[in-house]
Each structure stands twice: as C-alpha cells, then as structure tokens.
Amino acid sequence: MTRRAGLYDPASKALGVAMLDFDGDGRMDLFVANDTQPNRLYRNKGDGTFADAAVAAGVAFSEAGVARAGMGVDAADYDDSGRPSLVIGNFSNEMMALYHNEGTGLFIDEAPRSAIGRASLLTLTFGCFFFDYDLDGRLDIFAANGHVADDIDRVQSRVTYAQRPHLFHNLGRNTFEEATPQAGAALQTKLVGRGAAYADIDNDGDLDVLVTANNAPARLFRNDGGNRNNAIRIRTIGTRSNRDGIGARVEVSLRGAPRRWQIVKTGSSYGSQSELTPTFGLGAETKVEGMLVKWPSGQVDTIGPLEANQIVTVREGAGVAGATPLRSAPGARP
C-alpha cells in the first residue's frame, strides 16, 4: 500500500510527521521531517496517491541548500493567514525552522531572521509544537531540547548534552520572543529532552506540557496563570466520520478578529501524541460569535454563539451535545 501510494522512501530517515492541507485544495497532505536527508512534503493527489513537492515548496533543504537533521515537526496557522505553516526541530548549529506558508505553493523559513533562529542555533530540538500557552489568541511554540552525544561539550564548548527547553511567545506580525526565562523555574532545568506533548490536565483552560527525557523521568509542566485570558475548548465526536473526528477543521469567529481554525489531529512533535481537543485562546473576548466544524465526511455543522470558558462537545450532524465549564483560576478574566 505504501509503495502504491507513492510514499515508499527507504533512503530517508523519518523522525517526525505532520498532516496539513498546505495548498488549500481540501485534501490532507503529509510532511515528513528527515534526519540528514531532504524533508518530504507529500501532496495528496486525491486518488489515493501522493507526490513529493518538498523541493518546489522550499521545505526540503535549509536556505543554504543543505539537508538538515529534522526531528520533530508541527503544522498550524500561527499568523491568522488561513494557511498552515511548519515548525521543525533540527540539530545543534542548524537552528529550528519556521516555514511560513506564502499561499503560492512556496514556504519561506522565517527562523533565521527571528528570535527563534538566534535562540535555537546551539540547541538540538526533538519535540516541538504550536500551542497558545497564554490564551491571547496567537499560537506560540514549545521545543524540547537535548543532544545525542553525552560528551559533546568536549568538542563544542558552547553545546551541552542536557539543554533547557524553548518557549517562544507569539507577539503577532510574524514576531516571536523567547519567553523561557519568564516562564518559571521549572523550565530552567536542563534535560536531555525528546518527546513533547500538551494537554489541559487540570481542566483550567490553559495547556500544560509533558516532556520525556533520556536517563530521567518524564517532566509534567503545569501551566499556572495561562488562563488569565479566556478560552474555549472543542471536543469532537464523529458519526459518519471517525469516532474522534480526526481530520475535522474547527473554525471560530470572534468580534473584530480574523477567523481562527485548528485541525483535530494526531501525531506531530516527536514520538508524542497531544490531546485531540482544540483549544482556542480568546483573549478578553467573553464569547465566540460563531463556529464551523468541517468533518472529513463533508458534513459541516454551524454552531453559536457560544460562551467562553467551557469545553463544548460537538457531535457530527447534531451540533452541540454538551458543555462543561472550565475551572477558573485566581486572576482569570470574569
């Protein structure tokens, strides 16, 4: 089946996979992050087969034309363009990649000109993902770091085996800043990080982070204070589509803001699975004007308005099947 689908690639070393509709044709494509081999971007042709478009799209190599050591990857619309972009974890001395989807079939790596590139030049990133840690409505980036050689500092004095994670705060207008120093003492601990995933473990609306590490226990970082802004979380139940609604596109409309969307997805990051429930940060907004859920079956459910600070269950073809309030924290917006 893999060979017939055009995905058979025994020469590559795949470590991270993300699904995205990069060309806006309504079909889910596949991105594969490869270690020391060109990345692959498999365009879904709609007939059960795929064609590699990575070179033409500008995501196969670095800007210098070199194949990097791709590890983890995630896809999301971090700039409200309506198009999914890519974040990729790479080897030390390569920096992370932030491929912005230009909407023309081409991606441009924004990392070398941003705080992301400067901060990640010496780190080796495995797990990475987009998520809105402060619920301001803009997707931020988390990266779990750690080298593969425990004596790397002998040959590269500025590179260490255990490394701190990165938390990049999205300031809007394609600008990020590293927020790790302000995120609390827990994120200052150096780890040989590998997998990374997120979930709201305490039902308070903000997203917590789990990181696995070599030769050490997993670390669960609870997000305290991220819910000072409002949020809405959407749980999907498929009927004609798959049970969990994987592949559904959830779009929310807010007063005076661009429509925001997320995909109910599996995979992404590195060796990890985050929760399926999309979480939308609403900032100061207290309700969602409207919501669309576009299911893999083709069914479209129109819902709303909805009050903020709840987890809403949507059943395919039936609309809202239930809603549960989120547990608010001291300092949360009323």
Regions found by a protein language model. Name each.
Residues 143-161:
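Short, conserved, GDST-rich strand-edge loop motifs in beta-rich repeat architectures
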Residues 40-42, 97-99, 164-167, 219:
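A short loop-to-beta-strand structural motif that recurs across blades of beta-propeller domains
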Residues 116-118, 157-334:
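Gly/Ser/Thr/Pro-enriched helix-cap/hinge segments flanking short amphipathic alpha-helices
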Residues 14-24, 28, 43, 70-79, ...:
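Beta-propeller blade termini
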Residues 2-10, 51-67, 108-124, 158-159, ...:
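Short loop/turn motifs that recur once per blade in beta-propeller domains
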Residues 45-48, 102-105, 171-173, 224-226:
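Short loop/turn segments that connect beta-strands within beta-propeller blades
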